[in-house]
UniProtKB/Swiss-Prot annotation:
Active-site positions on this chain: C394 (nucleophile)
InterPro entries: 23S_rRNA_MeTrfase_RlmD, MeTrfase_TrmA_AS, MeTrfase_TrmA_CS, NA-bd_OB-fold, SAM-dependent_MTases_sf, TRAM_dom, U5_MeTrfase_fam
Function: Catalyzes the formation of 5-methyl-uridine at position 1939 (m5U1939) in 23S rRNA.
Classification lineage: Bacteria, Pseudomonadati, Pseudomonadota, Betaproteobacteria, Burkholderiales
Gene that produces this protein: rlmD
Taxonomic superkingdom: Bacteria
The name this protein goes by in its record: 23S rRNA (uracil(1939)-C(5))-methyltransferase RlmD
Entry's Gene Ontology BP terms: rRNA base methylation
GO molecular function annotations of the record: 4 iron, 4 sulfur cluster binding; iron ion binding; RNA binding; rRNA (uridine-C5-)-methyltransferase activity
rRNA processing found in the keyword field: yes
Record organism: Bordetella avium (strain 197N)
Pfam families assigned: TRAM (PF01938), tRNA_U5-meth_tr (PF05958)
Domain TRAM: 1-55
Amino acid sequence: MVDEVLKIESLDLEARGIARRDGKVVFVEGALPGERVYAATVRRKPSYEIARVETVLTPSSQRVEPRCPHFGVCGGCAMQHLEPTSQVAIKQRALEDTFWHVGKIRPQRVLPPLHGPTWGYRYRARLSVRVVPKKGGVLVGFHERKSSYVADMRECHVLPRHVSDLLLPLRAMIAALSRPERIPQIEVALGEGVTALVLRHIEPLNDHDITVLRDFAARHNVQWWLQSKGPDTVHPLDPAHGDTLAYTMPEFGLRMPYRPTDFTQVNHAINRSMVSRALKLLEVQPTDRVADLFCGLGNFTLPLATQGREAVGVEGSKALTDRALEAAARHGLEGRTRFATLNLFEVDVSWLRGLGYFDRMLIDPPREGAHAVAQALSQLTPAERPRRIVYVSCNPATLARDAAIMVHEGGYVLKAAGVINMFPHTGHVESIAVFESLADDEVLHVQQQARLKAELAAQEAAEATVQAGAASEQPA
């Protein structure tokens, strides 16, 4: 049913227009801020509705024609109909709003956004595979939007052109395998001049399958890696391909090798800009000792080691820290780097003190954030704490949560923050924030007030528990 005309006020990070009707929020798929649209309601909830655009009556000046013919069906992109600079502005607003709503803080300065290529930027991707006879056989691509179905993709403009051109040949190749229905996914990882494809196969491959893979690799100049079970089972079909994937950071003289299933940034161009900005914001001095928490393969640790006295990388996986150490040695940085393997989701202040004093700190956690690290930092005395911290985030909500701890309990100031457009045309918000410690007496005051507040909250909770227990013992 087509509803009355809706006026779109804003946009959420799923690229849904937000309108209001009779006091209820309406999320309108396909609409942009400032537009007047006819929309069909597709779902009604007590506090909100979801609708779909039927007709755009007054188009936004920010509306553009999506480049991809699959846009709107494929779930890989959500914002191709919105002009790229407007996409970034929406992400910046979302970041600032989240800081305030979650943490009751605002950055003193908004950093200019980091921009990079908006098309052909995805150097990593996970493509699902399904055998669907009704759609002509095998499908290879991203999931449909909000669905477990695989989109019928024939091209993809956020993948590099040569990878997009593989989508149809991959369909034919998988169809030629002995058990195509037992191939659930293919991961794509690109290095400089190298394209690696990781084939997830639930059942063992036979000689015929191996021949098909080798023929495809020779015809399309790709490497095949095979994965029969978990990540530890990944290995190259050709052993000579074991250490050929890499990305470079020429401004630091670094070449970073990695395996196709390792975590590396999707957008190599933005990664270089991000690392450069992080180091500039940290203001590392030649005498500084710097910590890099959640260091992974050393994406920040090795550049930090080129500028400071010592860079200490900490990561939960020993396999990653071992390889980061190998990369450091390959560049002659073993004397200026150290790596530790620790679960950073369970650290406390005594662990942090055990690592020694750091002049600067970089934190780059996964989506879960760095809650335990933020709590430990907030308990350090003025003499023990890093004076400046840069936090790189892929989740505004956990960044705001951790920032609130550092500011309201630890005596840090949120000096600056801004977005990194790592994933153009999606709602994903990557960001970077800079924290600086207050003066020593101000830090002590903030920490004391936080302790008093926590003690009062604990006392009130205990009293409420006693009262609830007493009430439950009263006769009916």
